[in-house]
Amino acid sequence: MSVAFRRESDEEHKEPRFELPIPPGPNLVTARGLTLIESRVAALEALEAATDDEKRDLRYWRQRLATAQLAPPPPEDEVGFGSHVRFTLNGQVREVRIVGEDEADPTAGLLALLSPLAQALIGAGEGDFVAFGGKEDAIEVKSVSL
């Protein structure tokens, strides 16, 4: 039969799906981040007829759970992993919490530890000025809390 008249399944035209990349470095998590990973694994394990994508996601989240390291709280007077930071950048006041890769959501103010902004803030204290984006004193840290 001619190929023109043969119905091909949608499966034949799908692009191959690769494993989700594991971010480099230690998998530091906050208590909230660990809870999010655990709930993601539980939700995926509860699926009886999982698709290939869901199975791939489950492998990823199981790996992230197995390597999760609950980070100790940072010092109260300096920015560290898990800190809530209020600062000014370009004349605008912003607030962020520094979290692990899997918990990060910049639109919700949750910055990944390895992001350039978080890296600039690490170690700063209230009242400090920090270089960012090639500018000295681009950021003024207003407050640091847990």
Residue ranges and their predicted role:
Residues 72-142:
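Non-DNA-binding regulatory cores of transcription-related proteins
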Residues 1-65:
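Helix-rich terminal scaffold detector
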Residues 62-75:
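Amphipathic alpha-helical coiled-coil segments
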